Amino acid sequence: EQSENNASQRYDPLRGEMVIKYGRDFLEKYFPLENLNWQSITGFKISDGSFIILKDNIETSLKNKHKFIGHRGDVNNPSAIILKNNNLHIEIIIDPKAFSAQQDSANISDIIVEAAISTICDNEDSVAAVDAEDKIICYKNWLGLMKGDLKSIFKKNGKTYERKLNPDRSYISKDGKKLKLHGRSLLLVRNVGHLMTSPAITLKDGSEIPEGIMDAFITSAACLHDINKKGNSRSGSIYIVKPKMHGPDETSFTDLIFT
């Protein structure tokens, strides 16, 4: 819903008010406070590793203090607060200069919610890669993801935009140490099943290569770029989804391929 006077402008105060209320209700639901509610909050600070929430001169804290993980910026004027619920993080961005914060009593400009903690990159034919040319694009994108240098530059409405992988996010933990969280989903790559073949590579007799074997070798080779730097895997592992295995023989063959 938009107010009639601001429907065509860059920022609509009525919609902004509704978004702010929605954000505060979200915080109230998952991070309730001791004696106050999030709708009335005017500021934040960090004191001796504790997260202090302010309503003017009144101080309070989270009911569950363990949900506070860390912050970014000055302890008396933090620029970000990191909270955690069910092993998922949220980041409260505080930026008085941001256009979106002008209407918020605590200068909250954004609430970033961790989601899609894992993402599957699909190489299956008939879905993402119908022919050899499509397959090359899939492999190229997967290689860029594993190397960390994948980006896309495009024009829209006369402006040039660049999309690239988000860097890791750095904070200060509540015990004063450096805290780093991943800025990207954990990526898995889906290979095809055993029954398909691909014209991308032909064998000596002119027959097409089994596509599952081709996927296994090329996607695994691309992952070698990530094993040591651990930009994707936290443990230096490779994550491959192998679908459509019909019984123990095909499962055993998959095990043979990857070992």
Spans of model-derived segments:
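Subunit-assembly interface segments of extracellular/virion macromolecular structures
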Residues: 257-258
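Catalytic alpha/beta active-site cores
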Residues: 1-253
